[in-house]
């Protein structure tokens, strides 16, 4: 392919009314002909030829206004747009409901455009910034400023992303506690739908990630447009396929009426909207999100130790002797970090009391945590701890002393959830108290990791200031304790998004560690997040949530593709199980550099009961592929898997990788290459012919290692 010099390539514009932002795979054309900037093209790179505005000018239809209503990045009714507006709000007397912004100034480079819009009548300014990141991710940010003398009640600030009519299908992601990140496909012809969240945190039920694509788009084929709003509170993504025949996504934070007031000479910054385009299917779109995360959004920390969390091992039954024995076994099998979960602080013998009182319970730990930490450290492991700072139990000293610190609406009695209430994180005194408690804990003990939980939804409460307060507290703690890694947990995967990502190093993907469910949960979560930031643990033989039983090999094969951990009382494990687990962890450590830096991909398969995914090094020197049978299908065979990540003319050696006894279905003879131990194929052979697989039992995986012949 012809490659351009991206540093010297000039702007493509027929006149000053078209801006062309680009990188080597993406073009974004912004029209400035109207009152506000409008994205008129968002897709594959368009090349060097000059563009004319007529390319984007449509007919004016009868039966409506006498112009083709433009879809601005901020859509507004004053321009004839009859869909949802980008800015919704008013002054206290109800005026100002229809702001009319006009571009007052702009600047741009080849990868960014910055616009200042002004409504002189309402004394409102709006700053919009559009940027193409090196990963190919498009970001839109904006800030609304009140230059007048009256407060402005903002009800919504959302950005519009146009999608061409050929995008006929939608992929949305959501689920429930213990079964997050399920994928749902729906047709998108002439309809409008909304992915909307009112729960006050990112939520298990609906995820702020949406993909639109051409008919039957797949992992490696079809054109895909995706978006994400980086925010850990309420959000709304409206998918409009009707209004003026402009298919578009209207993306942003969801605000409750009266929740956000912009006072004179103050501003409000909207959550960042992230967008991707791929002409090669879903996996390519996700890889752009992954690259974006890796290259700058997250606080980089290369240490991702194998973790043992004590929750499912002992629950609230904290006992020094038991925990030191558990630490001994953990160190023996290769664990690198030992995490003490819920139950260590004052009054916390069950989930009805103690939240808010963040001091070590002297009745359980008469000598503090130092003896346990010293024992863990002597075994060569790091020590981590669990907390849930945003919550409080009514049965706690904190609540008895400060009942007014609880988040509530008006005079109504707040509703408990999991026997707990929510602290008002908008209050600086609340945040200062929590900062002091957690800082004292981190200063007193050698703690390298904090699992930060959030175990209930908000009810009848504004989420905006609550979310910002949590960000501020986490940011302060990260700044003062840069050596500590933080994990975002919210009853599992209830708070995973780009908004909280700068403040944390890891996410707890789901409270369910059942490997059969986790296969689908992790697939969905990796649509946005790279595997190395997702906690993937090997659970006990019987899942504590589903009560299903699975082999260690299957549990390990599932947990391999992420930040590995253990959620299992290893004191109950047999010597054989411990030895097997030690072997798995040793294998993981050799694969960790590949798994945490390579290109993560999914592949389509004709049998919906078969999942194919993997990770390939950027130079294709090595790869690991998983083939999983979720359930029995119409055929006993596993049809060949077609792998599209590899250079056509390069040669590769393919070998099976066994983490235990292979779970082959009944057979007389295996494919010859498996008995032989390897096979050599070109990249073209892998994509066109496919790799022949063995017959698999339900709930089992077959792992393949691929090495490039240099």
Give a label for each model feature.
Residues 25, 142, 265, 308, ...:
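Conserved, mostly hydrophobic/aromatic
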Residues 67-71, 77-100, 217-235, 276-298, ...:
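Glycine-rich, aromatic-flanked loop segments that form ligand/cofactor-binding clefts
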Residues 101-103, 260-279, 699-707:
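Short Pro-Gly-centered flexible turn/kink motifs
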Residues 207, 219, 605-648:
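Carbohydrate-binding surface patches
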Residues 301-436, 449:
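Aromatic-lined carbohydrate-binding/catalytic grooves of carbohydrate-active enzymes
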Residues 366-368, 400-402, 406-551, 563-568, ...:
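Active-site neighborhood of glycoside hydrolase catalytic domains
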Residues 631-710:
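C-terminal beta-sandwich/jelly-roll accessory domains of carbohydrate-active enzymes
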């Amino acid at each position: 392919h012809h490659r351009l010099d991206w540093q010297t390539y000039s702007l493509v514009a027929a006149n000053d009314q078209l801006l062309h932002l680009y990188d080597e795979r993406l073009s974004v054309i912004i029209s400035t002909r109207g009152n506000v900037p409008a994205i008129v093209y968002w897709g594959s790179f368009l090349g060097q030829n000059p563009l004319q505005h007529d390319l984007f000018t449509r007919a004016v239809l009868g039966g409506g206004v006498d112009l083709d209503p433009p879809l601005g990045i901020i859509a507004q009714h004053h321009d004839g747009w009859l869909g949802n507006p980008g800015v919704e709000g008013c002054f206290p007397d109800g005026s100002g409901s229809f702001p009319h912004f006009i571009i007052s100034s702009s600047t741009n480079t080849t990868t960014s455009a910055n616009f200042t819009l002004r409504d002189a009548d309402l004394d409102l300014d709006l700053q919009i910034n559009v940027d193409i990141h090196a990963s190919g991710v498009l970001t839109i940010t904006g800030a609304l400023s009140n230059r007048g003398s009256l407060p402005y009640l903002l009800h919504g600030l959302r950005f519009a992303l146009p999608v061409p009519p050929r995008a006929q299908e939608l992929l949305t992601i959501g689920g429930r506690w213990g079964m997050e990140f399920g994928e749902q496909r729906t047709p998108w012809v002439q309809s409008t739908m909304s992915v909307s969240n009112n729960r006050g945190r990112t939520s298990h039920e609906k995820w702020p990630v949406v993909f639109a694509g051409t008919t039957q788009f797949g992992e490696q084929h079809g054109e895909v447009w995706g978006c994400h709003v980086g925010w850990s509170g309420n959000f709304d993504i409206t998918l409009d396929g009707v209004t003026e025949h402009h298919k578009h996504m209207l993306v942003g934070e969801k605000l409750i009426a009266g929740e956000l007031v912009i006072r004179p000479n103050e501003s409000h910054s909207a959550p960042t909207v992230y967008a991707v385009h791929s002409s090669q299917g879903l996996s390519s779109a996700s890889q752009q999100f992954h690259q974006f995360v890796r290259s700058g959004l997250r606080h980089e920390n290369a240490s991702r130790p194998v973790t043992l969390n004590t929750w499912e091992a002992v629950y609230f039954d904290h006992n020094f002797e038991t925990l030191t024995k558990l630490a001994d076994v953990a160190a023996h099998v290769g664990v690198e970090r030992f995490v003490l979960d819920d139950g260590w602080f004052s009054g916390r013998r069950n989930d009805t009391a103690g939240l808010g009182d963040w001091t070590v319970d002297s009745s359980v730990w008469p000598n503090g945590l130092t003896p346990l930490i010293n024992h863990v450290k002597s075994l060569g492991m790091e020590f981590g701890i669990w907390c849930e700072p945003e919550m409080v139990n009514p049965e706690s000293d904190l609540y008895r002393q400060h009942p007014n610190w609880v988040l509530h609406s008006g005079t109504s009695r707040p509703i408990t959830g999991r026997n707990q209430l929510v602290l008002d994180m908008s209050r600086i005194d609340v945040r200062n108290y929590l900062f002091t408690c957690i800082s004292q804990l981190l200063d007193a003990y050698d703690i390298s990791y904090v699992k930060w939980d959030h175990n209930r939804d908000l009810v009848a409460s504004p989420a905006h200031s609550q979310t910002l307060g949590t960000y501020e507290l986490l940011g302060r703690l990260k700044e003062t304790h840069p050596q500590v890694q933080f994990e975002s947990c919210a009853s599992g995967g209830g708070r995973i998004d780009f908004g909280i990502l700068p403040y944390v190093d890891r996410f707890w993907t789901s409270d369910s560690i059942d490997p059969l469910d986790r296969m689908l949960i992790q697939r969905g979560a990796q649509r946005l997040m790279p595997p190395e930031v997702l906690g993937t643990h090997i659970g006990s033989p019987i899942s504590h949530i589903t009560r299903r039983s699975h082999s260690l090999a299957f549990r390990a094969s599932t947990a391999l593709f992420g930040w590995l951990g253990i959620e299992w009382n290893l004191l109950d494990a047999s010597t054989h199980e411990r030895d097997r687990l030690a072997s798995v962890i040793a294998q993981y450590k050799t694969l960790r550099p590949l798994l945490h830096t390579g290109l993560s991909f999914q592949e389509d398969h004709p049998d919906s009961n078969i999942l194919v995914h993997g990770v390939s090094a950027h130079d294709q020197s090595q790869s690991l592929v998983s083939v999983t049978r979720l359930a029995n299908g119409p055929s006993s065979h596993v049809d060949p898997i077609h792998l599209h990540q590899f250079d056509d003319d390069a040669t590769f050696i393919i070998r099976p990788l066994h983490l235990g006894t292979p779970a082959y279905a009944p057979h007389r003879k295996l494919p010859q290459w498996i008995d032989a131990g390897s096979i050599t194929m070109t990249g073209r052979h892998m994509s066109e012919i496919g790799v022949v697989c063995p017959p698999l039992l339900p709930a089992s995986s077959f792992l393949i290692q691929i090495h490039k012949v240099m």
